[in-house]
C-alpha cells in the first residue's frame, strides 16, 4: 500500500486467538460496559434529580460521568463486536471517528479533573469567595471550556494523524485505533510531525498536572492549619475521591506510553491498554460513591424508586419539586396567590378553581339538570 488513500480499512489486534477466549472476552467486556453504564448513569441521574446536589462539585462530577460514558462507549462496543463475530476489520472512516472521540473524551476528562482540583482549592483555601469564584455561570463557562478544549485537542491530533501517508500495511497492534500504532504505519518522513504532536500533548498534560499539584499543595497547607481533627478529616475526605481518580488516570496513561521498550510485549501492552482505557470509567463512579456520603445517599434514594422523602411525615416523591410542593403542607406556605383578591393557595390547581369565582365560569355541570 503506497499511501493512506489506498487503505479502506484497518486490522485491529484480536483480544484472543481461540474462539472460546474470544467469547469470554466478549462476556467480560459486556459486564464491564454494563457496570460503567450503570454506575455513571446513576451518578448523572442522582445529581440531575437531587436538588441538594446542585453544587459546583457535583456539577463537575456530572460532566465527568458523561465523559466516562463516552470514553467507554468509544472503544468497547467495537471490541465486543469483533470478539463476537470473530473479525478484526474497522473501516478507515470508522478508525478516524474512533480516534477522534477517544481523544475528545480523554482530553475533556483531563481538563475537567483539572477544573475539579480548582474547585477543591477554592472550597478549602478560599471558602469566603466560593460563591463568587464558582457561581453557576462561572461553572458553566469552565465546563464548556473543558469540552471545547477536548474537542480542539482531538481535532488537531486526528487531523494530523490521518493526513500522514501510510506505507507499512494496515495492521494495528491495538484493539482500538490509537495514535502510536497508526504512526507505526506511516512513512519515515513523518517523524518530525510525530515529535510535534508529542510536544503539544506533553505541554498540555504537564501544564494540567502542575496546576493540579499546585492546588493540592495549597490545600495540604490549609488543611494542616485547621485546628480541629474533625475539620481536617472532613477536608481530606472531600479531596480523596478526586485525588484517587486523578492518580488512576495519570498513572495508567503515563505508564502505558512511557514504559521502557525492554519490558514491552503484545500481551502486556494489551493488558495495560485495557487498564487505562476501560477500567477507569468503571472505577470512577465507585470511588466517588463510596467516599461521598451525600452522593451515596442520593444514589440509594434514586434506586428505591421514590428518591425524595419528606423529613416531616416520611412520604416519598419522584422528584424534589414534588417534595417541595408537599412540604408546604407542613410549613403552611401558600405560594400561589390570586391576582384579583390576593388570597393564597398551596396548589396551583386550587388557585385555578378559585379564579372561576372572579371570571364567572362554571366548568362543572350536573349531569341531571345541567
Language-model regions: role of each:
Residues 1-305:
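Transmembrane helical core of 7TM receptor-like proteins
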Amino acid at each position: 500500500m503506497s499511501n493512506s488513500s489506498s487503505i479502506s480499512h484497518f486490522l485491529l489486534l484480536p483480544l484472543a486467538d481461540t474462539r472460546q477466549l474470544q467469547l469470554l472476552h466478549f462476556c467480560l467486556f459486556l459486564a464491564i460496559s454494563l457496570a460503567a453504564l450503570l454506575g455513571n448513569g446513576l451518578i448523572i441521574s442522582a445529581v440531575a434529580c437531587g436538588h441538594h446536589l446542585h453544587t459546583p462539585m457535583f456539577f463537575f462530577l456530572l460532566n465527568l460521568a458523561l465523559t466516562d460514558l463516552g470514553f467507554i462507549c468509544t472503544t468497547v462496543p467495537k471490541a465486543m463486536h469483533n470478539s463476537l463475530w470473530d473479525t478484526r476489520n474497522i473501516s478507515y472512516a470508522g478508525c478516524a471517528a474512533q480516534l477522534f472521540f477517544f481523544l475528545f473524551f480523554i482530553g475533556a476528562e483531563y481538563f475537567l479533573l483539572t477544573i475539579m482540583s480548582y474547585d477543591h482549592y477554592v472550597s478549602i483555601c478560599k471558602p469566603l469567595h466560593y460563591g463568587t469564584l464558582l457561581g453557576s455561570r462561572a461553572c458553566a463557562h469552565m465546563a464548556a471550556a473543558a469540552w471545547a478544549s477536548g474537542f480542539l485537542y482531538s481535532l488537531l491530533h486526528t487531523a494530523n494523524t490521518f493526513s500522514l501517508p501510510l506505507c507499512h500495511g494496515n495492521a494495528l497492534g491495538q484493539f482500538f485505533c490509537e495514535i502510536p500504532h497508526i504512526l507505526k504505519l506511516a512513512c519515515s518522513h513523518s517523524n518530525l510531525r510525530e515529535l510535534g504532536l508529542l510536544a503539544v500533548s506533553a505541554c498540555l498534560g504537564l501544564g494540567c498536572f502542575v496546576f493540579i499539584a499546585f492546588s493540592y499543595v495549597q490545600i495540604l497547607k490549609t488543611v494542616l492549619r485547621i485546628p480541629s481533627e474533625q475539620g481536617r478529616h472532613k477536608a481530606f475526605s472531600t479531596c480523596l475521591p478526586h485525588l484517587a481518580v486523578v492518580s488512576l488516570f495519570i498513572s495508567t496513561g503515563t505508564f502505558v506510553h512511557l514504559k521502557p521498550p525492554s519490558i514491552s510485549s503484545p500481551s502486556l501492552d494489551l493488558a495495560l491498554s485495557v487498564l487505562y482505557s476501560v477500567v477507569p470509567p468503571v472505577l470512577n463512579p465507585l470511588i466517588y460513591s463510596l467516599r461521598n456520603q451525600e452522593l451515596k445517599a442520593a444514589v440509594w434514594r434514586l434506586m428505591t424508586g421514590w428518591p425524595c422523602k419528606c423529613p416531616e411525615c416520611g412520604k416519598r416523591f419522584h422528584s424534589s419539586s414534588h417534595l417541595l410542593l408537599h412540604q408546604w403542607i407542613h410549613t403552611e406556605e401558600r405560594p400561589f396567590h390570586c391576582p384579583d383578591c390576593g388570597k393564597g393557595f398551596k396548589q396551583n390547581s386550587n388557585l385555578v378553581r378559585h379564579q372561576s369565582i372572579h371570571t364567572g365560569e362554571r366548568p362543572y355541570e350536573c349531569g341531571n339538570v345541567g
